Amino acid sequence: MSDFDETAKTLNFDAPNSYIGRSVTRPGARRLAQGRGQFVDDIVLPRMVHVAYVRSPHAHAKIVDIETKKAAAMPGVVRVVTGAEIALVVKPYVGVLTHLAGMRSPPQYPLAVDVARWQGEPVAAVVAQSRAEAEDAVEAVAVEYQELPAALDAERALDPGEPKIHKEFDSNLCFTRTVDTGGVDAAMKSAHLVVEDTIRFGRHTGVTMEARAILADYNRADESMTVYHCGQSPHMVQGIVASRLSLDEHRVRIVVRDVGGSFGIKIHTYGDEIAACALSLMLGRPVKFAADR
């Protein structure tokens, strides 16, 4: 008899508080079905502005020049900010996961500085009175790129001749992990049939009902920041915002109300979200960013 069978003997699956085999009622379902959810994009604060980002169309490119005058003169535009400007108020961070020991990442900023290293990386931010005005002005920002060789295949990216995406490192290796449960060779030899195959799949992500969103409100009077966020890790966000913007952690308040789905994508903190916080710090007013599809 297995350990599971022994354990199962001690469990009462018919206990009144057991969820096994029962339909579980969602306490908040009625409120959400009535349209009474409280999501980040529902929040409107006095003097609030919106940010949209100019993103690199290239997987790897040098940023030669960014012309912002035309965009800055468009209706509703409050400010256009480049990576070099935002780097003055944000400490660089490394994009690693602490539970993956040895993961490598060079210091980086919320907006690309000098070089864009992935397609879609923000290179400039446009802040305007409305989201529509910000998105319209994004189209007026002229960025001159010098396209660089890119590593486009995950398998070939480790070849010595492949372009190095981060000049700080000698290869494109992010991290390594070895999983060894023991007895693998013996199991393969004794198996009736061994099937080997290479399975390829395309890019995928979690597509949530509510896209990523953040509303940062910096109060210059008491040097505090309130961040309305739809993520799953408010304490982590508090620490990151405080450390990157040189704020006392107890002066950073994270408010998470309803989270419109995640599938894992809202566990992390993203550069465009930190950029929104930095812009609120720079402007002294609430700044909202809501991602689109």
Residue ranges of each PLM-predicted region?
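Solvent-exposed alpha-helices and their adjacent loops that cap or buttress functional pockets
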Residues: 25, 43-47, 108-110, 115-120, ...
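Residues that form or immediately flank small-molecule/cofactor binding pockets and catalytic motifs
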Residues: 38, 85, 199-200, 232, ...
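Alpha-helical support elements that line or immediately flank enzyme active sites
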Residues: 53-88, 124-145, 214-257, 262-283
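Short, Lys/Arg-enriched charge-dense amphipathic segments
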Residues: 102-115, 169-183, 273-282
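Helix-loop-helix junctions that connect adjacent transmembrane helices in secondary transporters/permeases
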Residues: 96, 162-245
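Structured beta-strand/loop patches that form or line metal/cofactor-binding pockets in enzymes
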Residues: 287-293
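Cysteine-centered functional microenvironments
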Residues: 120, 255, 293
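Flexible, low-hydrophobicity surface segments
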Residues: 1-171, 194-197, 289
